[in-house]
């Protein structure tokens, strides 16, 4: 029951396509609709961040057997954009990686500064890898997947 799909993310239309395909992949593997929706939200947030902050990137979706016999779905967002300056701050709602977001700038930013926090709340695991050539954000889902806890 393994599967992998990779989507280039360069434009806003890619965000919608990737979100739809993530939900579809989850449902094809028996994930309940609500949990599949949470996977789609995570993919949407990560893909949106690639478009907003990255130079170019991709979303990879992996489905594999978990150690407990259930499924594990992993979302890997990779880009060659700038590093996240302060990850702990970026995870706070209403903040970017430099600090609180000025409410007067919300409309031009295209977001409320809740994306990474939402990813952390919805996924069962979150890892951020930053290197000189870019970064990867890895969100893992196992809770609520077929055969899992």
Language model segments and positions:
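Conserved ATP-binding N-box helix of the HATPase_c
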Residues: 33-60
């Amino acid at each position: 029951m393994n599967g992998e799909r990779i989507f280039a993310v360069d434009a806003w239309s890619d965000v919608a396509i990737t979100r739809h395909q993530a939900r579809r992949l989850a449902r094809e593997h028996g994930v309940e609709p609500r949990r599949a929706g949470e996977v789609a939200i995570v993919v949407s947030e990560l893909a949106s961040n690639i478009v907003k902050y990255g130079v170019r990137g991709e979303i990879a979706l992996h489905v594999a057997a978990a150690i407990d016999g259930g499924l594990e779905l992993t979302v890997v967002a990779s880009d060659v954009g700038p590093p996240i300056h302060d990850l702990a701050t970026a995870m706070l709602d209403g903040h970017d990686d430099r600090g609180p977001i000025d409410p007067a700038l919300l409309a031009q930013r295209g977001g409320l500064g809740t994306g990474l926090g939402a990813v952390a709340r919805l996924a069962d695991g979150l890892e951020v890898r930053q290197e000189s050539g870019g970064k990867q954000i890895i969100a893992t889902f196992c809770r609520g997947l077929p055969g899992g806890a």
